Regions:
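His/Asp/Glu-rich mid-to-C-terminal helical/loop segments that flank catalytic regions of hydrolases
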Residues: 58-119
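Metal-dependent peptidase/peptidase-like ectodomains
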Residues: 1-80
Length: 119
């Protein structure tokens, strides 16, 4: 699954993000919905405003083994029918493989940054 990279990330963070993504056989692409301002609405935005390095990344909309457009259609369906509604919960048919990959990715990027003496 591709990852989405927000342009506000610092250079060393971006370098580590690309390294780990490549090791996982993944690609990093720009935010597919920048008009929604996800980075600016995030919990870590106040830290980033004050110069604290912030990793802003998330799962994309392309899925391995699915046709182009499948992920966007599912995302649009979820947003229209479930997002911030009583039905907004984990569904039994959700494939969490990408979420596991994301957790491994974030951990490894964070670990490598923690081992670095510069930002």
């Amino acid at each position: 699954m591709p990852l989405v990279l927000h342009p506000e990330a610092k250079a060393l963070i971006v370098q580590r993000m690309h390294e780990v993504a490549a090791e996982q056989g993944r690609v990093i692409r720009p935010d597919h919905e920048p008009e929604k301002g996800g980075f600016y609405r995030s919990d870590h935005f106040p830290f980033a405003q004050r110069g604290v390095p912030a990793l802003a990344s998330g799962g994309g909309i392309d899925y391995v083994g699915r046709p182009a457009g499948w992920g966007k259609a599912r995302s649009d369906e979820y947003t229209a029918n479930d997002y911030h509604k009583p039905s907004d919960k984990v569904k039994p048919d959700w494939d969490m493989t990408g979420a596991v990959q994301d957790l491994q990715y974030y951990w490894m990027v964070g670990y490598r940054l923690a081992q670095s003496d510069t930002f």
